[in-house]
């Protein structure tokens, strides 16, 4: 059973054009918005090491160039793995076996598949069967007039029904989901708690909350959902701009084991 004692914070390293940037600027740049939005934090390895030094046990690395078809930063992901000695999960543009093997070869503990779950379902099922707990599925969700739809290709395309996909993935044995309301990613508008509760009600696999965290209160509220299956939260924009320091986030959600 998931509990507050095991709730994890996943500080993010969002990579665009070879640089780690604030989540908001990274997301908007990959959507083709002005380059004046660039808000660099440093090299991916430098940023990951800073999060490790602040107490993180996991790092969440996002290759937004790969996710949006603009290129690959696999060499920089390898640099991150060489710089830290904590767990790393990687996502972005991992859509076939060749790319998956290349990313796993960096030594990362987990890979998140997103677009592939919709566009390459047979291979996705094979990956889940072969790699087990090393595979999580990113459910990037957009609310539409037709219900919850999945956002793919760096959140630039909407397709597929959330509940249909979740049912199929559960049958295929998916062991973990990363659930993000894409309208809240990088926006610090608070997580979509209703969405998280609905997903947890339909699967017994653990869920990581992605996107929208704006305060310590948001993190405490997410940790309270550990009883229904939320095992952690990705911390991006609020961390990157200093609104929620990582040390405070860890203390607020993991105090029972400190």
Swiss-Prot record:
Protein name as annotated: 1-(5-phosphoribosyl)-5-[(5-phosphoribosylamino)methylideneamino] imidazole-4-carboxamide isomerase 2
Pathway of action: Amino-acid biosynthesis; L-histidine biosynthesis; L-histidine from 5-phospho-alpha-D-ribose 1-diphosphate: step 4/9
Cited Pfam families: His_biosynth (PF00977)
Gene3D superfamilies: Aldolase class I
One GO biological process term: L-histidine biosynthetic process
Record CDD domains: HisA (cd04732)
Similarity comment text for this entry: Belongs to the HisA/HisF family.
Superkingdom in the source lineage: Bacteria
Active site: 14 (proton acceptor), 140 (proton donor)
Catalytic activity: 1-(5-phospho-beta-D-ribosyl)-5-[(5-phospho-beta-D-ribosylamino)methylideneamino]imidazole-4-carboxamide = 5-[(5-phospho-1-deoxy-D-ribulos-1-ylimino)methylamino]-1-(5-phospho-beta-D-ribosyl)imidazole-4-carboxamide
Keyword hit for Isomerase: yes
Keywords: Amino-acid biosynthesis, Cytoplasm, Histidine biosynthesis, Isomerase
């Amino acid at each position: 059973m998931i509990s507050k004692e095991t709730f994890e914070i996943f500080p993010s390293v969002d990579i665009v054009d070879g640089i780690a940037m604030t989540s908001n600027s990274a997301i908007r740049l990959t959507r083709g918005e002005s380059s004046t939005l660039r808000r660099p934090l440093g090299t991916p390895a430098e940023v990951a090491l800073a999060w490790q030094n602040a107490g993180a046990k996991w790092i969440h690395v996002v290759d937004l160039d790969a996710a949006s078809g603009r290129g690959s930063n696999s060499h920089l992901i390898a640099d991150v793995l060489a710089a830290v000695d904590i767990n790393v999960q990687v996502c972005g543009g991992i859509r076939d076996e060749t790319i998956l093997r290349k990313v796993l070869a960096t030594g990362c503990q987990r890979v998140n598949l997103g677009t592939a779950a919709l566009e390459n379902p047979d291979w996705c099922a094979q990956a889940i069967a072969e790699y087990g707990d090393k595979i999580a599925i990113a459910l990037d969700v957009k609310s539409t007039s037709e219900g919850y739809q999945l956002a793919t290709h760096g959140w630039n395309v909407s397709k597929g029904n959330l509940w249909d996909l979740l049912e199929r993935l559960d049958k295929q044995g998916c062991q973990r989901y990363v659930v993000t309301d894409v309208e809240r990613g990088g926006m610090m508008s608070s997580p979509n708690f209703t969405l998280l509760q609905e997903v947890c009600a339909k699967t017994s696999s653990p869920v990581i909350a992605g996107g929208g965290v704006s305060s310590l209160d948001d993190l405490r509220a997410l940790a309270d959902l550990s009883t229904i299956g939320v095992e952690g939260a990705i911390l991006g924009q609020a961390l990157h701009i200093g609104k929620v320091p990582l040390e405070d986030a860890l203390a607020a959600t993991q105090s029972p084991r400190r």
